[in-house]
């Protein structure tokens, strides 16, 4: 339940990060195909990263801690390992998800072709570096304090937030997926061009 709520917080952060990127690169803020300001894919990504890798200074591979000790050398090795694995996860993840999604739905959700050092339309070195750096900062400086704060909340409050927010966010995501995959329409609830 605590990890679920943390994932929903990350879904909101992902929504605003994507909108910030779109504002800077295209001068637009939009709904990101959602009614609510949450992108469920970031919940899934945060769970995968945490369950597989832990946090940057205490990196692991699932249950196995990669670098023993809490000295600076172990932490540095841990951070380098974490950065490289996250970079590869994002780099190949965007290619795989973008390719599969476009093949299945016939819809293109993003295109990095206009960005220097793009590898395919789905990924580029600058975006992957930026996203990896963002993950490093969030997982090292935000994740543990967030979990501590959530764990201090009354259990029933966490459970209610999980059910209410989780139901709304997953339903919103499913509406988007059905709209794109079956009706071939990306739901555009609102957009502001600057």
Where in the sequence are the language-model features?
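Aromatic-rich, lipid-facing transmembrane alpha helices and their immediate juxtamembrane interface loops
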Residues: 1-194
């Amino acid at each position: 339940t605590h990890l679920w709520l943390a994932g929903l917080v990350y879904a909101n952060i992902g929504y605003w990060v994507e909108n910030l990127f779109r504002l800077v690169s295209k001068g637009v803020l939009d709904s990101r195909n959602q009614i609510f300001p949450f992108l469920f894919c970031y919940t899934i990504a945060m769970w995968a990263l945490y369950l597989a890798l832990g946090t940057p200074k205490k990196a692991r591979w699932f249950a196995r801690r990669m670098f023993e000790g809490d000295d600076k050398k172990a932490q540095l090795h841990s951070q380098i390992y974490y950065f490289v694995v996250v970079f590869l996860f994002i780099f190949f993840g965007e290619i795989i998800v973008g390719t599969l999604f476009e093949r299945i739905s016939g819809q293109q959700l993003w295109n990095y072709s206009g960005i220097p050092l793009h590898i395919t339309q789905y990924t580029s070195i600058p975006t992957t570096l930026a996203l990896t750096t963002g993950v490093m900062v969030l997982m090292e400086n935000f994740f543990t304090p967030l979990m501590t704060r959530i764990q201090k909340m009354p259990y029933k409050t966490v459970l209610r937030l999980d059910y209410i927010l989780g139901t709304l966010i997953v339903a919103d995501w499913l509406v988007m997926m059905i709209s794109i995959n079956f009706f071939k329409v990306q739901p555009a609830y609102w957009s502001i061009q600057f």
